[in-house]
């Protein structure tokens, strides 16, 4: 049959972003080809704990909501356990609203400290941001949460921020995580996968 042809060429896939390697049958010569295509941005937003993908008219979609920016942490201790909170009858991760004149990393650390009583936090990396919607007194809210992986060597007592409806704060072993995830929110499940 001759030279190898990538699927994009043989199946006629137009309008895709493809980086293809075309090699002859002896694999002695390779040629890289890049085909550019502007792909639409996709946003996954959780509505009543169900994910929906928004691709078109993001600005129009957002215009119907009041945007709240927040940050939180996926916090690991020295035993590789994950910090979780129990709030509103669901297992969750510590997070909260961005305050004025605060950057997103400061917000993430402050919220973990306030909601759990944990200190000595260090940010390891940015994980992702998630979106979810809810309603308060008839006002539609779109919350964007920036998530960070964090470490701590904290060994003290965990203290739930009861004013925020948090009734329990625990360190969770990996083998207990599935049980907690079953009673959690969609965006938290996604983050912990």
Language-model-derived ranges and their functions:
Residues 98-186:
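Unchanged
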Residues 34-72:
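Acidic, metal-coordinating catalytic segment for phosphate/diphosphate chemistry
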Residues 63-92:
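Short, contiguous, helix-prone interaction/anchoring segments in small proteins
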Residues 1-34:
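Intrinsic disorder/low-complexity segments
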Residues 190-193:
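A small-molecule sensor/coupling module
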Residues 22-23, 46-48, 77, 135-136:
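Acidic surface patches and DE-rich sequence motifs
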């Amino acid at each position: 049959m001759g030279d190898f042809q990538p699927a994009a060429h043989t199946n006629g896939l137009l309008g895709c972003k493809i980086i293809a390697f075309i090699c002859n049958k002896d694999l002695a010569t390779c040629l890289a080809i890049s085909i550019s295509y502007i792909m639409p941005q996709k946003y996954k937003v959780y509505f009543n704990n169900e994910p929906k993908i928004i691709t078109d008219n993001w600005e129009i979609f957002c215009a119907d909501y009041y945007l709240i920016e927040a940050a939180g942490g996926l916090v690991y201790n020295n035993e590789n356990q994950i910090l979780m909170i129990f709030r509103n009858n669901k297992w969750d991760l510590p997070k909260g609203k961005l305050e004025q004149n605060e950057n997103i990393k400061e917000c993430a650390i402050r919220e973990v400290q306030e909601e759990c009583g944990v200190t000595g936090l260090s940010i390891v990396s940015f994980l992702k941001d998630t979106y979810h919607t809810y309603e308060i007194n008839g006002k539609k809210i779109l919350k964007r949460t920036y998530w960070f992986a964090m470490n701590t060597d904290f060994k003290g007592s965990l203290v739930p921020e009861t004013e925020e409806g948090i009734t329990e704060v625990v360190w969770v072993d990996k083998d207990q995580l599935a049980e907690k995830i079953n009673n959690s929110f969609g965006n938290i499940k996604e983050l912990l996968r």
